[in-house]
C-alpha cells in the first residue's frame, strides 16, 4: 500500500448539515463557489425539504467557511447539530 492510499484510509469524512434559505435561483450562483472550495469533497442541496438542507462532506472542519460564504451571498445558513 502506498503512502497516499494509507492517508486516504485513515482520513475521516466530516459531514456538516445546514438549514438554509437557498432557492433554486441561488443554486446557479452557489454551485461554482462550492465546487471551487477545495476542502469540500462532496455537497448537495435538498430543495424539497422545507429547511433547504445543504449537506457538505469534507476531511476538514469547514463549518465557519460555509456559513461565511453563504452569508456573503445573502443566504441564511445555520449549522444543524
Describe every region a protein language model picked out.
Residues 19-22, 55-60:
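Short beta-strand-to-loop capping motifs
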Residues 59-81:
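C-terminal structural segments of small proteins and small subunits
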Residues 2-5, 35-42:
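Short amphipathic beta-strand starts and helix->beta connectors
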Residues 15, 51-53:
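A generic structural signal for beta-strand entry/edge sites
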Residues 43-50:
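RNA-recognition motif
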Residues 19-38:
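Short amphipathic alpha-helix segments
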Residues 5-22:
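Short glycine-/aliphatic-rich beta-strand segments at the starts of folded cytosolic domains
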Amino acid at each position: 500500500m502506498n503512502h497516499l492510499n494509507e492517508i486516504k484510509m485513515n482520513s475521516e469524512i466530516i459531514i456538516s448539515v445546514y438549514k438554509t434559505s437557498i432557492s433554486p435561483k441561488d443554486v446557479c450562483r452557489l454551485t461554482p463557489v462550492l465546487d471551487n472550495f477545495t476542502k469540500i469533497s462532496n455537497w448537495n442541496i435538498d430543495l424539497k425539504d422545507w429547511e433547504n438542507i445543504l449537506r457538505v462532506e469534507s476531511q476538514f472542519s469547514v463549518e465557519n467557511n460555509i456559513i461565511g460564504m453563504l452569508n456573503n451571498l445573502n443566504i441564511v445558513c445555520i449549522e444543524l447539530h
